[in-house]
Amino acid sequence: MDQFIKQDETGDLIETGMNVANHFLSAPIQGTNSLSKATIIPGVAPVLIGNPEQKNIQYPTTSHQGSKSKGRGSGARPIIVSSSEGGTGGTQVPEPLFAQTGQGGIVTTVYQDPTIQPTGSYRSVELAKIGKERMINRFVEKPRTSTPVTEFKRGGPGAAAQGQTIQEEGIDGNGASAGSKERSGSLSGATPYAHLSLPQQDSTPANVGIAPQSAISANEIMDLLRGMDARLQHLEQKVDKVLAQGSMVTQIKNELSTVKTTLATIEGMMATVKIMDPGNPTGVPVDELRRSFSDHVTIVSGPGDVSFSSGEEPTLYLDELARPVPKPRPAKQPKPQPVKDLAGRKVMITKMITDCVANPQMKQVFEQRLAKASTEDALNDIKRDIIRSAI
């Protein structure tokens, strides 16, 4: 079934209903006996009996509605009924079709033109027309001129909760709101992060951006400041340690300069020694230099002083290779080896025979060998045999 009703069908239904209402409203009222007390709308009975009301009648329901009606009293718009009939003006005629509005118990009144005195039949027809127009206006929704303004609350609900707006019916007017107490939804005390909201089709579009991130709370800021203070103190301690090492670095530099000076002095002294003693020529082995310093025959030819050889024997001898050489030098006699004191060694070996040799026969043999030994090698052989026998 189609849920949408066309505007033409709606107009036909309203027209049929208004024709029925005009038929019953056009009939003259015979008296108060034709209406019971339960069927009369409050505020309309004096009009029906010929005593119109002079003031607006209000029926406050609760204290809350009464407070609202004070601030919204300007929302009840009177209706001016024009007529060609003459009479006494200034009479207020209440609207019987819409006597109660449902907001604060306000009775809507109809003000007549001051120069016109309405009659029963004319009043019924005019009120029926006005009721028809109001009923049509109720079925046809007018476009909104502005979006509903919601009260801004710091730390209110999130974006999902903000999207659900409760619209209350009321009169056209502004009133003071007592507000509501709710727990803050944000610990930082700022507006929570909200996504980009799409413009509504039935309202005036406006450029809306993304709300900024939530502000950092005071506790978080203090924690950050304390952390930065601790890091700064730690950094200051490190800087103090670095400055304390500065004196040591200066001392190391001075010692390094002293070492460089000493090294330069040593290099200068070595250069001086090289100048005084150039050393071996490059590429000449030491053996060849030593052979050049050995004795060899020197032949002197021509006139000269021969006194250096006059005292020597002028005889030449031939060596094993038949080479003429002067008198051969006598062979070197080997130096006699100094006689070592063997008495101490013999005492030591005698003690070893007594302690290490258990066999009496072996002891006797070692003692005889020790008595005959006269050299160091013989004593070493005896000592070696004693150690082997003991093992």
Swiss-Prot record:
- Bias kind Polar residues: ranges: 55-65
Pfam families under this entry? Paramyx_P_V_C
Q: Which residues carry this modification: Phosphothreonine?
A: 10, 16, 39, 91, 150, 165, 250, 258, 282, 298, 375
Modified residue Phosphoserine is at which positions? Answer: 69, 188, 257, 292, 294, 301, 374
Region annotated Multimerization sits at 216-279
Transmembrane stretches in the record are none
Alphabetical keyword list = Coiled coil, Phosphoprotein, Viral RNA replication
Locate the region Disordered.
Answer: 55-90, 145-208
Give the Gene3D superfamilies listed for this entry.
1.20.5.300, DNA helicase RuvA subunit, C-terminal domain
Q: Where is this region: Interaction with the nucleoprotein?
A: 343-391
Q: Which spans of this chain does the record mark as coiled coil?
A: 218-245
What InterPro entries does UniProt report for this protein, alphabetically? P/V_Pprotein_paramyxoviral (IPR004897)
Function according to Swiss-Prot or TrEMBL: Essential cofactor of the RNA polymerase L that plays a central role in the transcription and replication by forming the polymerase complex with RNA polymerase L and recruiting L to the genomic N-RNA template for RNA synthesis. Also plays a central role in the encapsidation of nascent RNA chains by forming the encapsidation complex with the nucleocapsid protein N (N-P complex). Acts as a chaperone for newly synthesized free N protein, so-called N0, allowing encapsidation of nascent RNA chains during replication.
Q: Which family does it belong to?
A: Belongs to the rubulavirus/avulavirus P protein family.
Quaternary structure?
Homotetramer. Interacts (via multimerization domain) with polymerase L; this interaction forms the polymerase L-P complex. Interacts (via N-terminus) with N0 (via Ncore); this interaction allows P to chaperon N0 to avoid N polymerization before encapsidation. Interacts (via C-terminus) with N-RNA template; this interaction positions the polymerase on the template for both transcription and replication. Interacts with host RPS6KB1 kinase; this interaction may play a role in the viral replication and transcription.
The entry's free-text remark on domains says: The N-terminus consists of a long intrinsically disordered tail. The central part contains the coiled-coil multimerization domain (MD or OD). Forms a four-stranded coiled coil structure. The C-terminus constitutes the alpha-helical X domain (XD) that binds to the nucleocapsid (N-RNA complex) and the L polymerase.
State the protein's name: Phosphoprotein
GN (gene name): P/V/I
